[in-house]
């Protein structure tokens, strides 16, 4: 994940994106909301039926960390809910060992470590543009939209 300020890259953060079959949708987004110690709404399938379970922050099954930065795809409603988020502190070693081989990945959301996310959530205002591009085709001049264009 690359962070820009005034068209200059100021930070690179190791990130996890969607695994095969649950790819992070490529496109232009904006940060629509931010929540500290968010409730996690997890899709689950039980007996062939899909449901959404609300898991409060602090619960042993909560996996998204201390911050949620919800994203809205520009020009259309978000199909589902994508956001930049962290990982439950008690599961960091397990999660990052499993996912940072780049073969597994997330269920679609960009994931970063909570220490970086804490910084970003405080620094980045709502409405900030987020461009999700294919990592092997990323090109700063073509894909980057500076904050002044937001």
Q: Which residues make up each language-model segment?
A:
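Cell wall/extracellular polymer interaction/catalysis modules
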Residues: 1-60, 64-78
């Amino acid at each position: 994940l690359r962070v820009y300020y005034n068209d200059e890259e100021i930070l690179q953060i190791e990130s996890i994106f969607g695994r095969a079959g649950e790819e992070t949708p490529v496109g232009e987004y904006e940060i629509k909301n931010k929540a500290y110690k968010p409730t996690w709404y997890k899709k689950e399938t039980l007996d062939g039926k899909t449901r959404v379970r609300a898991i409060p922050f602090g619960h042993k099954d909560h996996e998204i960390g201390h911050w949620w930065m919800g994203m809205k795809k520009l020009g259309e409603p978000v199909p589902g809910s994508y956001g930049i988020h962290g990982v439950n502190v008690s599961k960091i070693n397990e999660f990052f060992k499993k996912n940072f081989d780049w073969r597994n990945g997330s269920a679609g959301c960009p994931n970063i470590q909570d220490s970086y996310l804490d910084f970003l959530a405080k620094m980045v205002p709502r409405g900030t543009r987020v461009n999700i591009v294919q990592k092997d085709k990323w090109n700063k001049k073509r894909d980057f939209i500076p904050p002044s264009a937001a």
